[in-house]
Amino acid sequence: MCAGCGHDSISSAIIQACFELNIEPHRVAKLSGIGCSSKTPDYLLGQSHGFNSVHGRMPSVLTGANLANRELLYMGVSGDGDSASIGIGQFVHAIRRGVNMVYIVENNGVYGLTKGQFSATADKGSKSKRGIANMDEPLDLIGMAMILGATYVGRSFSGDKQQLVPLIKGAI
């Protein structure tokens, strides 16, 4: 993982939340898209179900799995590039359809795997490693989720486990 990356902290918080809620791993299906979050299904809850879908399409794959087996707890983990760029339509329609899932967006405002381009959620004026400022207004995924009628919306810093674990438990 890159220095300062929050993905491992988020995976750890998911594990702790499931443990505290006594959720048996075989009752969980974890799905991801492409990007830094793509390996998340491999990092947590051994003996659970996991699938890494194509770029931006995790919500549709999760929807299909949910229709096939409604007995599982579905957790989708996606990056800001995966959800706010190529997968923005998937993000919107999964919420609009009310898919029974926990959808975690790991948002760092940057495409880490492709050397640091700004994602659609990067703050306007933030600077890249090369000193170039982002000129675009960021997409607000939290605001969009609320407007679209998501039943539970939360935001946390990946490094604050005391805040993150209860938010994930609430989402579950």
Roles of regions detected by a PLM:
Residues A3, G76-S78, Y152-F157:
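Short catalytic-loop micro-motif centered on adjacent basic/acidic residues
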Residues F19, G46-S48, F91-H93, S119-A120, ...:
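Short, solvent-exposed amphipathic alpha-helical segments in soluble enzyme
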Residues I34-G112, Q163-P166:
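Thiamine diphosphate
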Residues A120-G170:
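Conserved thiamine diphosphate
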